Amino acid sequence: MQLNSTEISDLIKQRIEKFNVASEARNEGTIVSVSDGIIRIHGLADVMQGEMIELPGGHYALALNLERDSVGAVVMGPYADLQEGMKVTGTGRILEVPVGPEMLGRVVNTLGEPIDGKGPIDAKLTSPVEVIAPGVIDRKSVDQPLQTGYKSVDSMIPIGRGQRELIIGDRQTGKTAMAIDAIINQKNSGIFAIYVAIGQKASTIANVVRKLEEHGALANTIVVVASASESAALQYLAPYAGCAMGEYFRDRGEDALIVYDDLSKQAVAYRQISLLLKRPPGREAFPGDVFYLHSRLLERAARVSVAYVEKFTNGEVKGKTGSLTALPIIETQAGDVSAFVPTNVISITDGQIFLQTELFTAGVRPAVDPGISVSRVGGAAQTKIIKKLSGGIRTALAQYRELAAFAQFSSDLDEATKKQLDHGEKVTELMKQKQYAPMSVFDQALVIFTAEKGYLNDVELKKLADFEEALLSYARGQFADLAKEIDSSGAWNKEIEDQFVKLVEDFKATQTW
């Protein structure tokens, strides 16, 4: 048989052309140990800090420890089925969560997946959970108020848009209640809200969601949940995920409010992860970077400039500043604010609202201690009318506390002292407020006006609550235009003062309570 070399070469060429090898470059490693949600991986040479690692079964782990011959990663999900020898793959991606207006009104987990049974979320965009905070040049000073609806807070410890105001106190002092009321008060203000629940019971979170829905505030709120039954990794990441969702609004010239409830539990989750990763422990067994854990989170709350918003949106949004206001919550043990995490967060934030157990049990709710509560930047943002009227409130309360302690030892007090005690007692009573009943600017201004101008001198202490309720009802009915004007402008002048005088005097002359 004669072999034709040309035919053979053509045949070989055809075979080579048809031969197809599908190949993909993958960064693959092997699990060498699994314990308590922490896996050690050998062979992932090019992995990044914070990279998502794909595990068998569709779950992911987060690379946190990059060591010479292995990678320590924390599993974001169930880890019972993971075994030594299993293959894992580096994704080359940092953890991202869905963001955008589609998230509003929904309850999601740390990864942005819906857990409220209302179907999938069609979010168009995602954002990394870890983002560098805006620089000094990109920021604008805080000068717009964020009304919490609490008389005691808005008058003595005002909060501005873009501020970080810590709510601190022992367990069962009304910290969550204050934050939820602040969210409810934003329902008609155009401010979006994000509530991040960290390490709480699922029943407690369900109750919060129900209350937000009842008061019409859930529609402009995103609830991010990492409950007590979730892994430490998800509890540690939840605040960053919520912050990324809030930054979407900030960077597009909108205003947003984020509540972290609470950062003590996040610090404990991070301590657990760090100890399991064998990082050296420091004070109270926390790792050395626990300050950075909170500072990099809270620095992302800011008021950003017009130029920043224009640059971020490529000129689509013009002439608007955006803001993200943070209300972190810290739980203290027996009132000890000098513990490690509380002192860290106090030094990072722009002020703190201190809630006292003694005041709470005495029926003063919200249990705000005006002596050690402070707002370092909110004064510039306070509504003009509240600023003008509330100057004497803090002084009256401070003098009352001082005199009340002195009066316990002395029976014969002069008239001036008795007057001061009576006034302080009434101001304390006036600062009390029911839960889920945030007050408008007009309502707050009117109540403070009656105290400051001496209209309460002839009102009995036990009838003060009835007096306040009747006065506000009368004012909303008879002076509706004035109420509307003050709620929208917050202005204060001689004309408004005269109308306030007329309102209160007419009420006292014609009404009963």
From Swiss-Prot:
Binding, ATP: G169, D170, R171, Q172, T173, G174, K175, T176
Membrane topology according to the record: Peripheral membrane protein
This protein's UniProt keywords: ATP synthesis, ATP-binding, Cell inner membrane, Cell membrane, CF(1), Hydrogen ion transport, Ion transport, Membrane, Nucleotide-binding, Translocase, Transport
Catalytic activity from the UniProt record: ATP + H2O + 4 H(+)(in) = ADP + phosphate + 5 H(+)(out)
Subcellular location: Cell inner membrane
A Pfam family matched in the record: ATP-synt_ab_C
Domain of life of the source: Bacteria
Chain segments annotated as transmembrane: none
Main location: membrane
Annotated GO CC locations: plasma membrane; proton-transporting ATP synthase complex
Cysteine disulfide links: none
Site (Required for activity): S373
NADP among keywords: no
Record-linked InterPro entries: ATP_synth_asu-like_sf, ATP_synth_asu_C, ATP_synth_asu_C_sf, ATP_synth_F1_a_nt-bd_dom, ATP_synth_F1_asu, ATPase_a/bsu_AS, ATPase_F1/V1/A1_a/bsu_N, ATPase_F1/V1/A1_a/bsu_N_sf
UniProt keyword Nucleotide-binding, yes or no: yes
GO molecular function, one term: ATP binding
Entry EC number(s): 7.1.2.2
Function: Produces ATP from ADP in the presence of a proton gradient across the membrane. The alpha chain is a regulatory subunit.
PANTHER family: ATP SYNTHASE SUBUNIT ALPHA, MITOCHONDRIAL
Subunit field text: F-type ATPases have 2 components, CF(1) - the catalytic core - and CF(0) - the membrane proton channel. CF(1) has five subunits: alpha(3), beta(3), gamma(1), delta(1), epsilon(1). CF(0) has three main subunits: a(1), b(2) and c(9-12). The alpha and beta chains form an alternating ring which encloses part of the gamma chain. CF(1) is attached to CF(0) by a central stalk formed by the gamma and epsilon chains, while a peripheral stalk is formed by the delta and b chains.
Protein family: Belongs to the ATPase alpha/beta chains family.
NCBIfam families: atpA (TIGR00962), PRK13343.1 (NF009884)
UniProt name for this protein: ATP synthase subunit alpha
Organism (species): Aliivibrio salmonicida (strain LFI1238) (Vibrio salmonicida (strain LFI1238))
Lineage, broadest ranks: Bacteria, Pseudomonadati, Pseudomonadota, Gammaproteobacteria, Vibrionales
